[in-house]
């Protein structure tokens, strides 16, 4: 979001009887941060601390396991996407503290705020890849046993990253810096040059490809997976399934406000009261979306073992227990054995 408002400033509150107060800004703006900005700063600080440390730990654990387990490859790429987004938080934090003044230049304006969109597309495409993997494990176990390998997983991740970069291009292209004089500061935002159709097209593509379509397809996918799992009364390998479902659910929860306000602002006039209200909430919506960058390590720890087990085990070993794939392999083999046994029984019956 962060679109520029090109409405003419209102100077109607000035008259020739006004006296100059050196302690008051000439445009009569307050030096106090708005409540949404303060909340955004608190969220940014927490997300940075938890996200950098948590995702760095996940990267460290899964990097050693990625050579032999496919689940580790999935979670490694998710953690890298979240970690890269968290690195931009100190810059965004500084900008909000300075009332959205951007002293970091045009290149940083194009790259750093766009990292959150890159994270959004990379995360949802990786989650879609993971979900397809879970679907095939349940419904095509023999195919998985024959063809599912680390090389194919890395290719799928590379495709997901490539598509994410492609979908983030509009944010890189349309982000510019603009200088204001009342008060004097430099702003970083999206400039569509008064082209509302282009702005709406970008917002619709972001909403459909980054939220609605994945929500529909993943809901259908996991509905079939859960129905099959319950019908078989399977107790093995439910840990990874629960972790993936929790990660998917958290993605849609934390990105919902950003998507809703973004699509609304693209269809509203910049001078409308609703647009101005949403613009004030922009930083808070971005910070809420950023929570998704630190929530995954927390999910992994909670999904580890019972409370006593978490006290007894070190954090790296706990994460390794959650993010490795041993139970998935057992599940695939168990499905394969059950399929072969069923085929053998049918052959004997004939």
Swiss-Prot record:
Keywords: Cell membrane, Chemotaxis, Cytoplasmic vesicle, Disulfide bond, G-protein coupled receptor, Glycoprotein, Membrane, Phosphoprotein, Receptor, Sulfation, Transducer, Transmembrane, Transmembrane helix. Changing residue 144 to S: Fails to homodimerize. Glycans are attached at residue 5. Its main location: membrane. Residues 1-37, 94-110, 175-200, 266-282 are extracellular. It is found in: Cell membrane; Cytoplasmic vesicle. This is C5a anaphylatoxin chemotactic receptor 1.
């Amino acid at each position: 979001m962060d679109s520029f408002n090109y409405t003419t400033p209102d100077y109607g509150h000035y008259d020739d009887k006004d006296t100059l107060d050196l302690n008051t800004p000439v445009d009569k703006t307050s030096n106090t941060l708005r409540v949404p900005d303060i909340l955004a700063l608190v969220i940014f600080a927490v997300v940075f601390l938890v996200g950098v440390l948590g995702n760095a730990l996940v990267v460290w654990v899964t990097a050693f396991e990625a050579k032999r387990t496919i689940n580790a490859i999935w979670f490694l790429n998710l953690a890298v996407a979240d970690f890269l987004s968290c690195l931009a938080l100190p810059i965004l934090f500084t900008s909000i503290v300075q009332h959205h003044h951007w002293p970091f230049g045009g290149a940083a304006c194009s790259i750093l705020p766009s990292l959150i969109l890159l994270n959004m597309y990379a995360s949802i495409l990786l989650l879609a890849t993971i979900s397809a993997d879970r679907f095939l494990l349940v419904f095509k176990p023999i195919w998985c046993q024959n063809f599912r390998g680390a090389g194919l997983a890395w290719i799928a991740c590379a495709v997901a990253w490539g598509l994410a970069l492609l979908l983030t291009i509009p944010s890189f292209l349309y982000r510019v810096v603009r200088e204001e004089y009342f008060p004097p500061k430099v702003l970083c935002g999206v400039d569509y040059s008064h082209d509302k159709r282009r702005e709406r097209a970008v917002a619709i593509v972001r909403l459909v490809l980054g939220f609605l379509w994945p929500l529909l397809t993943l809901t259908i996918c996991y509905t079939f997976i859960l129905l099959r799992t319950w019908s078989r009364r399977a107790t093995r390998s439910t840990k990874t399934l629960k972790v993936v479902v929790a990660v998917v659910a958290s993605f849609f929860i934390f990105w919902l406000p950003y998507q809703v306000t973004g699509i609304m602002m693209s269809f509203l006039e910049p001078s409308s009261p609703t647009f101005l209200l949403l613009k004030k909430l922009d930083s808070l919506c971005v910070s809420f979306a950023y929570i998704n960058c630190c929530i995954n390590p927390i999910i992994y720890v909670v999904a580890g073992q019972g409370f006593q087990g978490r006290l007894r085990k070190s954090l790296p070993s706990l994460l390794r227990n959650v993010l490795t794939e041993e139970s998935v392999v057992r599940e695939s083999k168990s499905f394969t054995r059950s399929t072969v046994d069923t085929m053998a029984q049918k052959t004997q019956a004939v």
